[in-house]
A protein has these predicted regions:
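Outer-membrane translocation/initiation segment of Type V secreted surface proteins
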Residues: 27-29, 523-545, 554-698
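Extracellular beta-strand/beta-solenoid scaffold signature
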Residues: 30-46, 62-78, 98-116, 122, ...
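Transmembrane beta-strands of outer-membrane beta-barrel proteins
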Residues: 341, 672-676, 707-711, 746-752, ...
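Extracellular beta-strand/loop-rich repeat segments of large surface/secreted proteins
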Residues: 424-425, 438, 442, 447-583
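Outer-envelope beta-barrel architecture signal
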Residues: 462, 667-671, 691, 702-706, ...
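Outer membrane beta-barrel translocator domains of Type V secretion systems
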Residues: 629-794, 901, 906
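Solvent-exposed, glycine/polar-rich loop segments of beta-barrel outer-membrane systems
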Residues: 689, 716, 720-722, 755-772, ...
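Outer membrane beta-barrel transmembrane domains
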Residues: 732-737, 819-923
Length: 923
C-alpha cells in the first residue's frame, strides 16, 4: 500500500501549473508532461516539495519559456528540501526574456548541500535576452550552477546538447555564458556530453559615462567547481562600441582567483572540438582568449583554437591570446592549431600561448600569432610567451610563428617587436624533447633573466628561421634539421648530429655559440661573385667559444657560380669561406672541413679547416682537394644527348624487320605498316622506353622495289637525376633489290626532326631544357638466302649504317648556355638468320648479329655567369644481338611478320624489343 501511495497519490493541488507543485508531504514526485511532439511553456521548478522530482516528457518535446528567466530551476533559497530534479527523455529548452529582467538561464541550480538536476537525456538549450534597455546589467547563461558552502556537492548533468546563448541590444553591461559554475563547494560539477556552445553578446550603449562591459565565455568555472564535457565546439562573440569600456570574449575560463589566501582550483575537462573567439569594439580594453586560466586547470583534447580581436575606432589596449595561464595554473591540450590575430587599438598585442608562473603542456600544435600594423598603433606578436618563476611550456611538435603584418597582409619586416618564443625570469620552454616530431619555427627566439628555451629539431623537415638570443637553453639539430639564422644570435649549448645551420645574417650580426658538440654543417649565404667567380660573403661570422673533444664542423656555401675550375681561385675561395669561422677553444677538440659543393657546372672542392691563434683564432684551409670536373648536372646532360642518337639508331632496322620477307609479296605495289616497342638502358644511369610507328608504300620495277615511309618515335627516359622525353618524326626513301639465287640488297636514306626535353634534379638545383635538331642516316644491307633441305634456309648478311645528328645551341631555365657539337655514328653489323619455310605459307627463324659502332667523339661546351666547362662523349661500342621471328602469308595479297630481339654485352643494352608489321600487295 505504501509503495502504491508513493507513486500514485498526489498530496498537492496544482495552482496555475502542474510543475509548480506543492509536494510538502511526498518524498518523491513523478509527472507525465506530454506524449510527444508537444511544447510546454511553464518553468520546471520546485518551490516547497521534499525529495526528488521526476518529469516524463515525450519524444521531441520542447520547453519554451517566454517572459521568465529560467527553464529548469532548483534553488535552495526557494525550497531547500528538494534534492533532485530528473528529466526523463530528451528535452529541448528555449528561454526568451525581452523584458527588463537582468538574467535568463536554460538550467539553473543554486544549491546548499547535495542538489542535482539530471537532464542526461540531452536536448538543445537556447537562451535569448534582448532589448533590456532599462537594465543596468543583462546576463544570459545556458547552464548555471552556484552554491555558498565549502561542503556542497551539487551536480547538473545536461547530456548531449547544442547550446545557443544570445544577449543582444542591452543598453549597459552585457554577459553571455554557455556553461557557468561557481561556488566554493569541493564537488560542484556540470557534466555535458557531446555538442556545441555558441554565445554572443552585443551592446548598443551610447552613453560615454560609467563602466560598461561586454563579456562572453563558452565554458566558465569559478572557485572550486568542475565542468566536464565530451567533444564540444565553442564559438564566442563579443561586440561592443566606442562607449563600452571593456569588451572581452573567452572560449574556456577557469578562474580560481581569491582576494586573499591561496587560489582555488577550478577545473574544466573537455574532449575534442574547435574554439573560435572574437571580440570587436571597445573603448579601453578589447581582448579575446581561447583559454583563460587563473589558478585553475584546463584539460582539452584535440581541436583548433582561434582568438581574434578587432579594436574599435578609439580602442586603446587590444590583445588576443590563444591560451593564457597564470597563478600556478595547469593547461593540457591535444593536437590542433592555436591562432591569435589582433588589429586596431593603440597597443595591439597577440600571444599564441601566454604563461605566467604556470604549466602548459601541448601535444602537436601549430601556433600562429599575428598583430596588424595599421600605421597608428604599436603592434607586438608572440608565439609562446613565458614569464615569472616556475613557468613551464612543453610542446611536443608542430609549428610556431609570430609576425607583424601590414593591413594588406604583407609581413612588416621593419617591425622587430615579434618573437616566435620569448621567455623571461626563470621560465622554461621545451620543444620536442624526447620525441621525433616535425618542428617548424618562424620568428626570433629571445630570453631574459634565467629563462631557457630548449629546442630539439631532429627530422629532415624540421626548420627554425630566425635569430636566437638565449644564454641558458639548448639547441639540438639532427638528421638534416635546419636553423636559418637571420640575425644576431647567442646560443648557450649547441649539439648537432648531421644538423645544418644556414647563415643569412647582416654582416654585423655574428652568431655566437658558447659550447658545441657533435658533427654538423654550417652553410653561408653568398649571392655575389666577381666575374672570375671569387666569392663575396656579406653575412656575419660564426664564433665558437668552446667545443667538446671530437667535435666536427663542415663549412660550406650556397652559390652555383664559385670558381673551382682554377686551383688558385679555388684556394682563394676556400680561405674566404674558412675566414668566416672563429674558434677560441682547444684546437684538438674541434676539427672540420671547408667544402664548396658541386655547382651546376663547377666541381666540388674541399680542404681541412684549421684555426690560427696568431690571426685572432680565425679559420683558414690546408690540404686542398678537388672533385670530378664533370658535375652531376653535366653528366645527366651528356646522357640526354646520348639517348637522342641511340633512339635514332634503334629506328634503323634490318630489311626483314621493316618489310618482312619481301619475296613472299605478290603484285607490283604494296603498302605496309609496322609498330615497334622496346627499351634500352645504360648501366644505372638511364632507362628509355619507346614506341615507334612507321607507314610505307613501294612499287616494283624489275628486280627493284622503290618506296617511301613516314615514321614517328616517342620515348620517355628516366635518369638517375631526373627524367626526359625524346621524339622524332622522319621521312625515309628506300630501294630494295631482289636478285637471283637469294641475293638481296637494301638501301635506306632517312631525314628527320628530333626533339629532346629534360628535367635534371641535383643538389645544385633544378635544370630544365629543351631543344630540337636534324638527324640523317644512310643504311646499306646485303645478304643471301641459301636454301637447304626440307625447307630449311640460312641467310648470312652484312649492314652498314651512317648517322648524324646536328649540333644545337640552347639555354636552360637556370641560365646554362649549352653549345653541343654534332654527333656521328657508323654502325657495322654482320650476322645471319636461320629458319624453316612451311609450304609457302610463311616461315619461322632465329637470328644473331655482331654489331660495332665506329663513332667518333663529340664535345659539348657549357657556360654560366662567366664560368665555362665542357665534356666529351664517345658512344663507340660493340655488342651482340639475338632474336626470333616469323613471316606468315595471310592470303595472296597480304602477309604478317614479327620478331623479338635482345642485345648483350654493350654499354647500352636493349633488354627487350618487339616488332610487328603487315603488308598488303596489289597490282
Amino acid at each position: 500500500m505504501r509503495k502504491d501511495l508513493k507513486y500514485k497519490i498526489l498530496l498537492c493541488l496544482l495552482a496555475g501549473s502542474v510543475l509548480a507543485a506543492n509536494t510538502a508531504f511526498a518524498a518523491e514526485y513523478t509527472e507525465t508532461i506530454s506524449s510527444g511532439n508537444e511544447n510546454y511553456s511553464a518553468e520546471i521548478k520546485s518551490t516547497d516539495g521534499n525529495g526528488n522530482y521526476t518529469y516524463n516528457f515525450g519524444t521531441d518535446a520542447k520547453l519554451i519559456i517566454n517572459g521568465e528567466s529560467r527553464g529548469i530551476s532548483l534553488d535552495y533559497t526557494e525550497n531547500s528540501n528538494t534534492n533532485k530534479i530528473i528529466i526523463n527523455e530528451k528535452l529541448d529548452i528555449s528561454v526568451t526574456n525581452k523584458d527588463n529582467a537582468k538574467a535568463a538561464y536554460g538550467i539553473y541550480l543554486q544549491g546548499d548541500g547535495d542538489k542535482e538536476i539530471d537532464r542526461s537525456g540531452g536536448g538543445n538549450i537556447n537562451v535569448l535576452v534582448e532589448d533590456s534597455e532599462l537594465s543596468a546589467f543583462a546576463m544570459g547563461s545556458g547552464v548555471y550552477l552556484t552554491s555558498p558552502s565549502p561542503s556542497d556537492n551539487n551536480v547538473i548533468n545536461i547530456g548531449n546538447a547544442d547550446i545557443n546563448v544570445q544577449v543582444l541590444n542591452a543598453k549597459y553591461g552585457v554577459e553571455a555564458y554557455g556553461l557557468t559554475s561557481s561556488g566554493i563547494g569541493d564537488n560542484n560539477k556540470i557534466i555535458m556530453g557531446n555538442g556545441s556552445i555558441n554565445v554572443k553578446g552585443l551592446s548598443v550603449n551610447e552613453d560615454s559615462s560609467g563602466f560598461y562591459n561586454v563579456a562572453v565565455s563558452g565554458i566558465t568555472a569559478y572557485d572550486n567547481t568542475e565542468i566536464e564535457t565530451g567533444d564540444v565546439s565553442i564559438v564566442a562573440t563579443a561586440t561592443g562600441n566606442e562607449n563600452i569600456v571593456e569588451t572581452v570574449a573567452h572560449g574556456i575560463t577557469a578562474n580560481g582567483w581569491m582576494s586573499s589566501g591561496p587560489y582555488l582550483n577550478p577545473k574544466v575537462i573537455t574532449g575534442n572540438g574547435d574554439i573560435t573567439v572574437t571580440a570587436q569594439g571597445g573603448l579601453d580594453i578589447t581582448n579575446a582568449n581561447g583559454f583563460k586560466v587563473v589558478g585553475g586547470t584546463i584539460e582539452k583534447g584535440a581541436g583548433n583554437i582561434k582568438a581574434e580581436v578587432i579594436g574599435g575606432t578609439n580602442s586603446y589596449d587590444v590583445w588576443a591570446q590563444g591560451i593564457y595561464a597564470e597563478a600556478g595554473s595547469l593547461v593540457t591540450k591535444g593536437d590542433g592549431n592555436i591562432t591569435a590575430i589582433a588589429q586596431g587599438g593603440e597597443l595591439t598585442t597577440t600571444y599564441g600561448v601566454r604563461n605566467s608562473e604556470s604549466t602548459v603542456n601541448l601535444d602537436i600544435v601549430n601556433i600562429s600569432s599575428v598583430a596588424v600594423n595599421d600605421g597608428n598603433n604599436t603592434p607586438s606578436a608572440y608565439g609562446i610567451y613565458a614569464e615569472g618563476n616556475n613557468a613551464e611550456v612543453n610542446v611536443q611538435g608542430g609549428s610556431i610563428s609570430a609576425q607583424v603584418n601590414n593591413v594588406d597582409g604583407v609581413t612588416d619586416n621593419n617591425n622587430n617587436d615579434s618573437y616566435a618564443i620569448f621567455g623571461d625570469r626563470s621560465s622554461v620552454i621545451n620543444v620536442n624533447q624526447r620525441t621525433t616530431n616535425k618542428v617548424v619555427i618562424n620568428g626570433d627566439i629571445k630570453t631574459g633573466g634565467k629563462a631557457a628555451v630548449n629546442l630539439n629539431l631532429n627530422t629532415s623537415d624540421s626548420v627554425l628561421t630566425g635569430s636566437i638570443e638565449d644564454k641558458k637553453g639548448t639547441l639540438n639539430l639532427a638528421n638534416g634539421a635546419r636553423w636559418v639564422a637571420t640575425g644576431y644570435s647567442e646560443v648557450n649549448e649547441l649539439t648537432m648530429n648531421q644538423g645544418n645551420i644556414y647563415v643569412d645574417t647582416p654582416f654585423w650580426a655574428d652568431v655566437s655559440i658558447t659550447k658545441y658538440s657533435g658533427t654538423g654543417n654550417i652553410l653561408f649565404k653568398a649571392d655575389d661573385t666577381d666575374k672570375e667567380g671569387v666569392v663575396n660573403i656579406d653575412t656575419s661570422s660564426v664564433i665558437f667559444t668552446d667545443a667538446e673533444k671530437g667535435s666536427f664542423i663542415n663549412v660550406g656555401i650556397a652559390n652555383n657560380s664559385i670558381n673551382t675550375l682554377d686551383i688558385d681561385k679555388t684556394e682563394e675561395n676556400l680561405n674566404v669561406l674558412a675566414g668566416k669561422v672563429y674558434y677560441a677553444g682547444d684546437n684538438d677538440n674541434l676539427n672540420g672541413k671547408v667544402v664548396i659543393k658541386e655547382g651546376l657546372i663547377t666541381p666540388e672542392a674541399s680542404a681541412d679547416l684549421v684555426f690560427d691563434t696568431a690571426n685572432n683564432n680565425r679559420g683558414s684551409v690546408t690540404n686542398i682537394t678537388g672533385g670530378n670536373r664533370v658535375t652531376q648536372t653535366m653528366d645527366a646532360m651528356k646522357h640526354i644527348a646520348e639517348t637522342a642518337i641511340v633512339a635514332w639508331r634503334q629506328e634503323d632496322s634490318t630489311l626483314s624487320q621493316r618489310l618482312g620477307d619481301l619475296r613472299e609479296s605478290d603484285g607490283g605495289q604494296g603498302i605496309w605498316v609496322r609498330m615497334s616497342r622496346g627499351e634500352f638502358n645504360y648501366d644505372s644511369q638511364y632507362e628509355n622506353q619507346y614506341n615507334f610507328f612507321q607507314l610505307g608504300y613501294d612499287w616494283a620495277r624489275g628486280n627493284w622495289h622503290y618506296g617511301a615511309a613516314v615514321s614517328h618515335n616517342d620515348g620517355e627516359t628516366t635518369y638517375a637525376q631526373g627524367m626526359g622525353e625524346n621524339r622524332s618524326t622522319s621521312l625515309s626513301l628506300y630501294g630494295t633489290w631482289l636478285g637471283r639465287n637469294g641475293h638481296y640488297a637494301d638501301i635506306v636514306l632517312k631525314q628527320g626532326r628530333l626533339s629532346n626535353d629534360f628535367d635534371i634534379y641535383t643538389e645544385a638545383g633544378h635544370t630544365h631544357g629543351d631543344y630540337d635538331m636534324w638527324g640523317t642516316s644512310l643504311s646499306g644491307e646485303y645478304g643471301r638466302k641459301i636454301d637447304l633441305k626440307d625447307g630449311w634456309y640460312v641467310t648470312p648478311q652484312a649492314q652498314m649504317t651512317l648517322m648524324r645528328i646536328g649540333g644545337e645551341d640552347f639555354t636552360t631555365n637556370n641560365g646554362i648556355h649549352v653549345r653541343q657539337d654534332s654527333l656521328e655514328s657508323a654502325v657495322g653489323r654482320v650476322g645471319f638468320e636461320v629458319g624453316k619455310a612451311f609450304d609457302k605459307k610463311g616461315s619461322i627463324y632465329a637470328k644473331a648479329s655482331l654489331l660495332h659502332d665506329f663513332a667518333g667523339s663529340a664535345d659539348t661546351y657549357l657556360s654560366l655567369k662567366g664560368l665555362s666547362n665542357s665534356y666529351s662523349q664517345d658512344i663507340g661500342d660493340t655488342w651482340w644481338e639475338a632474336g626470333l621471328g616469323f613471316n606468315y602469308k595471310v592470303n595472296d595479297s597480304s602477309y604478317l611478320y614479327a620478331d623479338v630481339v635482345k642485345t648483350f654485352g654493350g654499354d647500352v643494352e636493349t633488354p627487350w624489343q618487339w616488332n610487328v608489321g603487315m603488308r598488303w600487295a596489289f597490282v
